[in-house]
Amino acid sequence: MAMRTPEELSNLIKDLIEQYTPEVKMVDFGIVFQVGDGIARIYGLEKAMSGELLEFEDGTLGIALNLEANNVGAVLLGDGLKITEGSRVRCTGKIAEIPVGEAYLGRVVDGLARPVDGKGAVQTKDSRAIESPAPGIVARRSVYEPLATGLVAVDAMIPVGRGQRELIIGDRQTGKTAIAVDTILNQKGKGVICVYVAIGQKASSVAQVLNTLKERGALDYTIIVMANANEPATLQYLAPYTGATLAEYFMYTGRPTLTIYDDLSKQAQAYREMSLLLRRPPGREAYPGDVFYLHSRLLERAAKLNNALGEGSMTALPIVETQEGDVSAYIPTNVISITDGQIFLAAGLFNSGLRPAINVGISVSRVGSAAQPKAMKQVAGKLKLELAQFAELEAFSQFASDLDQATQNQLARGARLREILKQPQSSPLSVEEQVASLYAGTNGYLDKLEVSQVRAYLSGLRSYLANSYPKYGEILRSTLTFTPEAEGLVKQAINEYLEEFKSQAKAA
C-alpha cells in the first residue's frame, strides 16, 4: 500500500471539513426532586406536553400527566426502583405507542403489549398510538349484524350486535367472566378476532381463562392483555387502551373484533390511585372529576365502520363489579350511561341455581334487536314478557293458597321456560339449537314433562335434530329464518323424540 504525501492528507482533511455540516440538537432535560408510589415530580421540562413519554436515566419510561407552574407530575411505566432524587429526565417528543399486527394472535402480553408468555418477541412492523381517537359519526354505520354469544338468555332477549357496547354488571362471583369467556368460545370459525383484557385480576384467574381458551382451540384467534393486581397502577390504567388499540388494527383491516374489559371498576380504582398521588382534587367516592372521560373515550372506540372503511367492527363487553347489587354507585351509573345496554347478573338468582344468573327484568339491549336473526325474533318475541309475568305471578303465588287453572298453567309454563335459559359453563349453543329449544318451550311441548326432565330432554332433542333432521340446521344457517319447512321439521322431531324420551324415562 502506497504511503500518502502530506499534501494529499491535508487535501483529504480539507474535503472532509468542507462536507461537515454542524447539527445542534436541543434536548429538554429535567431533574427528579421527588419519586415514590409510581409517581415522579420533576423540575424543568418546560416544553413537556400532556401525555408525552419521558425517559429517565435508568431507561424507565413515564408519562407526563400533571403540568404545573414549576414542576411536572409523571407516572412511571415500571417499578422505578433505580430512579433517585437528582436523576435526569428527558422529553422524547412522542406519545405512548405500541406495536400491532397479526403476530399478536394467540399471545399473552402486558399493559404495554410486551409478551409475557415466554414465546419470544412479537415480530411486527406496524404500530399505533395507545390513545387513538374514536371513529367519527361519518365513519360509522348502524349496528345490523348479530354477534352470537351462544347463551340462550342473551341471544333471545338481550341480543348483541357487532359494533355494540354491552355492559356485563353484577356482584363478585356471579359469573360475569364466564359470560365473556363463553362469548369468545362461541366465535370459533366465525372470523371474529377477540381481545381479553384482564385488569387488576389474580394471576390464577387469568391462567384459568387462558387454559379454557387453549383447551377449546380459541387462543388461535384471541389476544390476552393482562395487568395483574401486583402491577403498577399505571399499567392497570393503560391495559384497556392497549387492548382497544390491538383490536383497532384488525377493525381497520375490515374484520369483526370483540374486546372484553375485565373489569373497568379496577381500572377506575387504579386511575383514582394515580390521581390522588398526583394531588388532583377528589370528587364523588374520591374519584377524580374526569373519571367519566376515562371510560367514555375507551368505549367510544367500539364501532361498526362504514363501507368505505371496510365494514370492520369492534364490539365491547365491559365488565363492572357492583357492591351488594348497587347499580346506582358512581362507576356503574357512568358506564351504564355510556354503553348500549347492560346484562345484569343477580347474586340471588346465581345462588338459587339459575346460571347464567341474568336478571331479565332490568337487563336491556338498546341496539341489538336490529341485529337479531329473524329466526330468533320469530320464536323469542314474547319470551321476555312471559318471563316477567311469570316472575310477578311466582311472587304472588307464594301468598295465595288456591289458584285458578289458568294461573297454574302459566306458572308451569314459566318454570319450564326458565329451565331453557339454564346453561352449563363453556357450552355455547348455535342459533339453530337455541331456536329449537325456545320453540319447544314457547309452544307448550315441554308442559308434558316434569320440570326436572326439561334440560335432559332438550339436550337429547338437539342431538336428535342434528342426526335425524340435518336439513333443519342447513335451512337456519343459510337463511337465518324460521321457515314453514324448518318449523315442520322441528315439530316432527319434537314429537318423535318426546315419545322416545318418555319410553326411556319409563324404562329407567
Swiss-Prot record:
Its EC number is 7.1.2.2. It is found in: Plastid, Chloroplast thylakoid membrane. Pfam families: ATP-synt_ab (PF00006), ATP-synt_ab_C (PF00306), ATP-synt_ab_N (PF02874). ATP binds at residues 170-177. GO terms for biological process: proton motive force-driven ATP synthesis. It is a peripheral membrane protein. The record marks 363 as: Required for activity. It is an enzyme of class 7 (translocase). One of its GO terms (molecular function) is ATP binding. It comes from the Eukaryota. Keywords: ATP synthesis, ATP-binding, CF(1), Chloroplast, Hydrogen ion transport, Ion transport, Membrane, Nucleotide-binding, Plastid, Thylakoid, Translocase, Transport. InterPro entries: ATP_synth_asu-like_sf, ATP_synth_asu_C, ATP_synth_asu_C_sf, ATP_synth_F1_a_nt-bd_dom, ATP_synth_F1_asu, ATPase_a/bsu_AS, ATPase_F1/V1/A1_a/bsu_N, ATPase_F1/V1/A1_a/bsu_N_sf. It catalyses: ATP + H2O + 4 H(+)(in) = ADP + phosphate + 5 H(+)(out). SUPFAM superfamilies: C-terminal domain of alpha and beta subunits of F1 ATP synthase, N-terminal domain of alpha and beta subunits of F1 ATP synthase, P-loop containing nucleoside triphosphate hydrolases. One of its GO terms (cellular component) is proton-transporting ATP synthase complex. PANTHER family: ATP SYNTHASE SUBUNIT ALPHA, MITOCHONDRIAL. In plastids the F-type ATPase is also known as CF(1)CF(0). F(1)F(0) ATP synthase produces ATP from ADP in the presence of a proton or sodium gradient. F-type ATPases consist of two structural domains, F(1) containing the extramembraneous catalytic core and F(0) containing the membrane proton channel, linked together by a central stalk and a peripheral stalk. During catalysis, ATP synthesis in the catalytic domain of F(1) is coupled via a rotary mechanism of the central stalk subunits to proton translocation. The alpha chain is a regulatory subunit. F-type ATPases have 2 components, F(1) - the catalytic core - and F(0) - the membrane proton channel. F(1) has five subunits: alpha(3), beta(3), gamma(1), delta(1), epsilon(1). F(0) has four main subunits: a(1), b(1), b'(1) and c(10-14). The alpha and beta chains form an alternating ring which encloses part of the gamma chain. F(1) is attached to F(0) by a central stalk formed by the gamma and epsilon chains, while a peripheral stalk is formed by the delta, b and b' chains. Belongs to the ATPase alpha/beta chains family. This is ATP synthase subunit alpha, chloroplastic. It comes from Chlamydomonas reinhardtii (Chlamydomonas smithii). The gene is atpA.
